Amino acid sequence: MADEGKEETGMGQVEEDFSVWKKNTPFLYDLLISHPLEWPSLTVHWVPSTPNPYVADSYFGVHKLILGTHTSGSAQDFLMVADVVTPTPNAEPGIGGANQDPFIPKVEIRQRIRVDGEVNRARCMPQKPTLVGAKTSGCEVFLFDYAKHAAKSQTSECDPDLRLVGHDKEGYGLSWSPFKEGYLLSGSQDQKICLWDVSATPQDKVLNAMFVYEGHESAIADVSWHMKNENLFGSAGEDGRLVIWDTRTNQMQHQVKVHEREVNYLSFNPFNEWVLATASSDSTVALFDLRKLNAPLHVMSSHEGEVFQVEWDPNHETVLASSGEDRRLMVWDLNRVGEEQLEIELDAEDGPPELLFSHGGHKAKISDFAWNKNEPWVIASVAEDNSLQVWQMAESIYRDEEDAEDIKEDITQQS
């Protein structure tokens, strides 16, 4: 009975937090789309291609999102492609905000591709955006070219273009090389990292791993290619370790215990070759320099509970975001580390100065989020409450950051 009371109190707090957030949305966001999904999605990913113009209104563009279903065996699972309509940068101020025209379709599921098991993670190949790698609750990684599949599955079976084999258990880690077309990394609970070249010739639509890396002492939570060096990638494990691998030698270059608890995610900075970030179950996000991994450069600890994901902003070198079991998606600006709190801001109660924004629109744990490279400051996030949200914080919140970058650029050009 005591547990039931605690659960009811917890749900009451969730509803109260959501109500406060909803009341403040007109002041916090320049864009906010909230779309209920039939089933929760564990994954969300922007298709890395230029948005198409929206036929009915040139002030809007159509982006594509990759989603999945998590039905827990209650229904057929699908990999999904959705259209998301957002205002273009040329749109008049206010378009897309809280008072956006309700008749403009915001999110529409355009394609459902049948898969075996729920989609743990799905990511598009950067060099061929219609090619999607999907890790499910099975051992195989599926490869689908959604351009070749009908809007609705014509078959009652999962029919991927390729089945990638090499794992013994399911997992979440998945990363396409930004440099080598077709190179796909996967990390799973079997403590293995598999590397495939999907351009290799398969046998009956089945492709074996080109190489299998082993070195972690427990499940691998995430893998990620380095953004500047085509030969390096990193892996994060439930053993608290960060491992940097070199594909030229197929050996570990570094292995360091960076957290006392699980490392759930890692992200290499797309601008600075030495900097990476990790998200951990110890409730922190940590920044590291690859040249000195024995101690973090900086630790951010505003999350309450485990942190499951961290991603650098592809458009701003010092900005990154993180999400955790506290239902919050936090955006950080490292330019503000060490700044004094201003009285006009809500002071230290709002967290450290580098905490730029905290998105509170989900009522349950956030499963995945993604920055939109084509639309600066736009993020898509999905949660266990079946919600998909596409949002952009108000310009007044991040303007200082962009002004600082412009000044820095002017100084560089003049010198």
Swiss-Prot record:
A GO cellular component entry from the record: Cul4-RING E3 ubiquitin ligase complex
Gene3D superfamilies hit by this protein: YVTN repeat-like/Quinoprotein amine dehydrogenase (2.130.10.10)
Alphabetized UniProt keyword annotations: Chromatin regulator, Nucleus, Repeat, Repressor, Transcription, Transcription regulation, WD repeat
Residue numbers covered by motif DWD box: 232-248
Gene Ontology BP, a term: chromatin organization
WD repeat residues: 166-206, 215-255, 258-298, 302-342, 361-401
Cited InterPro entries: G-protein_beta_WD-40_rep, Histone-bd_RBBP4-like_N, WD40/YVTN_repeat-like_dom_sf, WD40_repeat_CS, WD40_repeat_dom_sf, WD40_rpt, WD_repeat_RBAP46/RBAP48/MSI1
The keyword Nucleus appears for this protein: yes
Major localisation: nucleus
SMART domains recorded: WD40
Compartmental location: Nucleus
Domain topic, free-text comment: The DWD box is required for interaction with DDB1A.
Family stated for the protein in its record: Belongs to the WD repeat RBAP46/RBAP48/MSI1 family.
Job of this protein: Core histone-binding subunit that may target chromatin assembly factors, chromatin remodeling factors and histone deacetylases to their histone substrates in a manner that is regulated by nucleosomal DNA.
Protein name: WD-40 repeat-containing protein MSI2
Gene: MSI2
